[in-house]
Amino acid sequence: MEPEPGNAQETEGVLNPAAVRGPDGELYLFPRLVAKGNYSRIGIARVRFNQAGDPSGVERLGIALEPEADYELRPNGGGGCEDPRVTFAEPLRSYLMAYAAFSAHGPRIALAMSTDLFHWKRLGLASFGPFEGIEFDGVDDKDASLFPIAIPNPSGHPELAIVHRPLFPGTRPEEIAGHPGLRGVDLHRESIWISYCPIATDGHASDCLGRFASHHRLATPVSPWERLKIGGGTPPILTRHGWLIVYHGVSELARTNKSPHPLCYSAGVMVLSKEHPQVIRYRSVEPVLTPSLPQERDGTVANVVFPTGIDRRDDIGMPDRFDIYYGMADNRIGAARLNLPKLLPPGGAADSQEERI
């Protein structure tokens, strides 16, 4: 999928889509549509497949969300609903969308709910309680996605869980790039987190939906390809090996005259324990997808593959095949195939036990 010629809503890019099967079994994408001035809406499109079962195009179906709430608007007339991930939350029997709401305060995680994917109810900004002296609220936060079922919180109680990446001051890739050799890593402030929210025992949405009170640090940068930053990608999906997440990592490329610290966004795989998702069973030592195509190397932001959507291909009798939908250089949407192996590869990187990479 790429910007439609003459469509003012897509002038600056079509990227970073959510992907989810609807009640009708069709696959729907929720791409970020960027208009002039970095004004972002969340669209909706139905995926078309060719005879081989591969995605071959989309049918645009309109807008799912556009900036309307105060937490999505900026004073200059701009605003943003960005980078959605959609999960069917089984305890709520509804679809939940986590997206970045971009206001004058910066990006924050917002939630919306739907039963049919076409009509969405805003739930407001997610809130996060403090953890060991760390204040999450008031901090830029992005790359969020939800587990489809309740999972045990740090106390062992089943709760709704969200994967997210707070962007504490000083932890952006642009701020870290250029530091030579080894550097100190603040494990709490440079990590992907899982945070937990109580849900009503009857499975209905409660008044505290979106209030995440407990937390667990999941992963921090380990390998060279993710040295500058790691962040969430596709929503967790359960496989026979555990919870599969395709996440992103950022490294620094060789300097050029145009950019003293050019960055490279790649994608890797993380598998979490089925019973205890706080435990990483496998993690990519090397990326599984890197910017190599011209559309990934040149665009609004060069050298970016940014995974956000995942689709298990049960529909064609291939449950070990996963189609990954990702942003290409912040301008287009690509698709890649990931085949689940019978056994996890040996030697997957563990999480960092020391504050140095």
Model-derived features: positions:
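Extended, compositionally biased non-globular segments
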Residues: 307-311
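Beta-rich carbohydrate-recognition and catalytic domains
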Residues: 1-16, 20-79, 88-141, 149-228, ...
